[in-house]
Amino acid sequence: MQRKTAVIVGGGPAGLTAAYELLKRSDIQPLVIEQSSQVGGISRTERYRGNHIDIGGHRFFSKSDRVMNWWLDIMPMEQTTEQAFAIQYQGQSRSVEQAGEGPDPETTDRVMLIRPRKSRIYWRRRLFDYPLSLSADTIRKMGLIRLGRAGLSYLRAAACPVTPERNLQDFIINRFGRELYNTFFKSYTEKVWGVPCNEIPADWGAQRIKGLSILKALKHALMKQRSGDVSQKNTETSLIERFLYPKFGPGQMWETVAGEIQERGGEVLLRHTATGIATANGAVRAVTVRNEDTGRETTIPADYVFSSMPVRELVRILDTDAPGSVRDVANGLMYRDFFTVGLLVEKMKLEDPQTGDRIRDNWIYIQEPDVLIGRLQIFNNWSPYLVADPSKTWLGLEYFCYESDAIWSRPDPELIELGTRELGKIGIIDPRDALDGCVIRVKKTYPAYFGSYTRFNEVRDYLDRFENLFCVGRNGQHRYNNQDHSMLTAMIAVDNILAGITSKKAIWEVNTEEEYHEAK
């Protein structure tokens, strides 16, 4: 009997997970099609002169045991003699032996590091805890008058919440009060999306900061537990204090998975783009693929198709005439684009007050309205192995825009100069300490919850009619998934195929629970 084939469009976490699961659990042959020159999608690692760039920052944690096990099967956790770092699940200790006898990152590359989490907000040229806490430091920096206003504003919101919550502004004010919304949320969020918060549906808050509020942040501050449980099931995501991280960044995980797929007999084609999908009788029959190096097109028969490509593009390349309303909704879906300025500096002006060394933050939310930069990563603090020279500081300056914006097309040297100037303006570096830089542009990084999104179910229902087409991943579902959610959509799609389940409902239900997300 001829072996069945699955064509997988997209070599990010969802696509590679689907391919690996098919090879591990079935005799279905996967073929991964990736448009770019490397795997990983937005979870890839870029490299520049020996330094590594994690695009957007990817902490490896999940409330899913299945995902945590999957990661550690691919890349074991580093050795540690400290019991506190043992991973635990639902009160049961797991992989204690691995945690105690894992590989040494000094001698082994295929290893997960255990890293401390620290994120803060930069506002009025000062650093504040994120999530906010009523520490002496916060009180001193905010001042009693502003703090009092924030407290009264929160009490007012708690007593008279906005109902119904029509937009993101309402969502945040109901949980933090208007004063803290204006102080710590408004500027950054509007940089990310390029539109006012009152024009963004509340769905975005439900996906990215759900479960968090002033009361939970205070409870966490007062009852801090350092149990060492990296999966931390009962901790709201933005309060998690430890995470796992591949030695050379998230791309190392997905490059390793791609290698495993090829060793098991699967194929991964880089610089190949899906340009057409043939359908018949309610199913996908073939995918046409273009080799970006030669321009040659090939049509590949498919028994199953997994798509993590943007939904807008998927509807466009289907050979069937979708109803006009479906095409209109698909064409109206919007995406926010993104670029990172990698900046190597001699040192930062911000120092740890206790040690005088480099601050320990993984990333910093820039809430300053007088600069365009939205977020700053300090790659040394993600993994010391991301930096060629540990005596220098390797930064990632994150900017959000549309591909049509003028800033997107500015030459790299101008963007490097912009980033250097802005960090100097807000007191994070001395521009004279800048040594080198690069620019990484990423299209369609963030599927937007505005545009035609409120009618997205019309597109979803149409695509679900194709019995062997599975929409997975962030852009594949037009949902603001983290990488573990993207993986779960692929895992469940494979589950359905192997179990003969035709309903796609469980795939779409991933990441709809009201308890999980890192605020980004």
Predicted segments with their positions:
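N-terminal Rossmann-like FAD-binding beta1-loop-alpha1 element of flavoenzymes
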Residues: 3-32
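Conserved Rossmann-like nucleotide-cofactor binding loop
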Residues: 14, 38, 312
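Glycine-rich FAD pyrophosphate-binding loop
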Residues: 23-48
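Mid-domain catalytic core of redox enzymes
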Residues: 25, 246, 270-427, 455, ...
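Dinucleotide-binding Rossmann-like beta1-alpha1 core, especially the glycine-rich loop
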Residues: 49-158
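Short loop/edge segments at beta-strand edges and connector loops
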Residues: 115, 270-272, 473
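Active-site/ligand-binding neighborhood in enzyme catalytic cores
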Residues: 135-138, 143-280, 285, 293, ...
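C-terminal lid/capping helical subdomain adjacent to the catalytic/cofactor pocket in oxidative enzymes
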Residues: 440, 450-520
